[in-house]
Amino acid sequence: MMIRDLGKLEFEAALAIQEQLAAGVAAGTSPETLLLLEHPPVYTIGRGGCRENVLDPGIRVVEANRGGDVTFHGPGQLVGYPVIDLGRRGRDLHRYLRILEELLINVAAEFGVAARREPGRTGIWTDGGKLASIGVGVRRWVTMHGFALNVTNELAPFRSINPCGIVACPITSLSAILGRPVPLGDVRRSVAGRFPFLLDERLPFLETAEPAP
């Protein structure tokens, strides 16, 4: 698997990179890739999102071909976009989502934060609120989009929306919980070191896999 650090990149530019990679992965000409980056401030909404969850009519919201509702991305938030060939890994989207949650729970624990799943919801949570959101798109059994882990980012912008479609949803970050800045680079390295091994353990490549339709 290739891991690429894109630094800080506009949402639309990152989407174009994902689409190019996804086409290559589906065709068997590109390796699976984990993109790690930050976005300048931007609100995005998934395919099934409800515009009523945008509480401030003055904000610009970008539509994204992923699951989930409306969320906010900004500097200090680690965004991960794994471009993964689920067609070669058993075509189990539910398990893939649980892997992303497990990854983020383990990363949070490395920094001394206890995070967990919430029944019936996607993402990870703490006693102080939601720590990370997950929204995935799949085309020809190749994944796009992924997760956003709050590290040092401002939390006030989340007040302009119902995050992930949840009314009065408290949002927190690693730094807010710990009461000190958490270096984003350290979190990035933890994610990059853990993800390939966790994915191969939980969703290994099949010896024979159907080609993408």
Curated annotation (Swiss-Prot):
The record marks 130 as: Lowers pKa of active site Cys. It is found in: Cytoplasm. It is an enzyme of class 2 (transferase). It catalyses: octanoyl-[ACP] + L-lysyl-[protein] = N(6)-octanoyl-L-lysyl-[protein] + holo-[ACP] + H(+). Its main location: cytoplasm. Substrate binds at residues 66-73, 133-135, 146-148. GO terms for molecular function: lipoyl(octanoyl) transferase activity. Keywords: Acyltransferase, Cytoplasm, Transferase. Its EC number is 2.3.1.181. GO terms for biological process: protein modification process. Residues 28-203 form the BPL/LPL catalytic domain. Belongs to the LipB family. This is Octanoyltransferase. It comes from Geobacter metallireducens (strain ATCC 53774 / DSM 7210 / GS-15).
